[in-house]
Structures are given as structure tokens and as C-alpha cells.
Design a protein with these regions (language model features):
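Adenosine-nucleotide cofactor-binding segment
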Residues: 11-77
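Short, surface-exposed basic-aromatic patches at helix termini and helix-loop junctions that form
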Residues: 9-15, 34-37, 84-87, 108-112
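N-terminal Rossmann-fold NAD(P) dinucleotide-binding loop
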Residues: 3-7
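C-terminal capping/lid region of NAD(P)-dependent oxidoreductase domains
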Residues: 63, 133-150
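Glycine-rich phosphate-binding loop and adjacent beta-alpha segment
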Residues: 73-138
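A general structural signal for well-ordered secondary-structure junctions
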Residues: 17, 39, 116, 140-142
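Proline- and acidic/polar-enriched loop/turn elements at helix boundaries
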Residues: 22, 122, 147-148
Length: 150
């Protein structure tokens, strides 16, 4: 849910020159995100394999590193997959209770990445209204959530 909502919001904000890339575990998920226009590219791979994620991420972004990476997973050992594709002075947003912040900090230092790391706490002011507003804006996303969760 969180990943789809982040993709939707990112697509609204990046403008005509932006590039929203999602990392998913299977082709079915990639096809779903693409069919719903929630990303420009969907990479199939495991966030526990940071080298693979880096290679695939750069391949769909013209060889350029990213400004922002948002990690939304429920498995450990995904920190470096979020950090490696991000440019120096870029931002990595960790929105996962599985994140090991010592691994993230030491990993970024070890590979020479000067990135801003933000810890998401699951709350932002007016988050419920923002979510409902986005579901009102996107009937396809609302319908998907209703079928899956109601």
C-alpha cells in the first residue's frame, strides 16, 4: 500500500522530466504498477541484492544516480539497495521498521556515499486526509485497494 501511494505521489511531483522507478519482487507487480501509471519504470529484483539493484537502477535512469530513494520494505538487509543508487547530497528515506540504521550509516560511509538519511516514523500531519484525497483523485488506485483490502 505504502509503495503504491508513494509512487502515485512521486509521479505527480516529478514533472515531465522526472523519472519514477519502482523496485518490485516479481514481474506481476511490475506489470501492475506500470498498468496503473504509478511509475515510469519497474525493476524486478530483490532489495537484499544491492549490486543488482544499483545496476538495474542506473540502466533505467540513463546511467545517472538518483536524487531520492524511498525504502518501503518489510525485510531486513535492504539498506544498501536504497543507498547505492543515490547521488552525493541526495536523500534516502527509510520508511521500514526492518531498517538497521547502524548498517545504513556504516554502509554509506564504507562506500563513500554522502547522502542525507531520513527516518520515517509513519506519521505526518494530516496524513489521513492526504491519503483519502489521493484515493479520490485516482479511482483506479482506490478500486485496487477496495478489491484487495475490503
Amino acid at each position: 500500500k505504502g509503495g503504491m501511494m508513494c509512487c502515485y505521489e512521486a509521479m505527480k511531483r516529478v514533472g515531465p522530466t522526472g523519472n519514477v522507478v519502482a523496485l518490485v519482487i516479481c514481474q506481476e507487480d511490475a506489470d501492475l504498477l506500470k498498468s496503473m501509471n504509478l511509475c515510469h519504470h519497474a525493476i524486478v529484483g530483490s532489495a537484499t541484492n544491492p549490486t543488482e539493484v544499483l545496476e538495474k537502477s542506473l540502466a533505467v535512469n540513463g546511467g545517472k544516480e538518483y536524487d531520492v530513494s524511498i525504502l518501503i520494505v518489510n525485510v531486513p538487509a535492504c539498506e544498501m539497495a536504497a543507498i547505492l543508487p543515490v547521488r552525493d547530497n541526495g536523500t534516502v528515506y527509510f520508511f521500514s521498521m526492518a531498517t538497521d540504521f547502524a548498517k545504513a550509516a556504516l554502509g554509506a560511509e564504507g562506500c563513500g556515499k554522502d547522502v542525507t538519511m531520513i527516518v520515517g516514523n509513519g506519521y505526518t500531519k494530516d496524513h489521513a486526509e492526504i491519503t483519502l484525497s489521493e484515493l479520490r483523485e485516482n479511482a483506479q488506485l482506490k478500486e485496487y485497494f477496495e478489491k484487495k483490502y475490503l
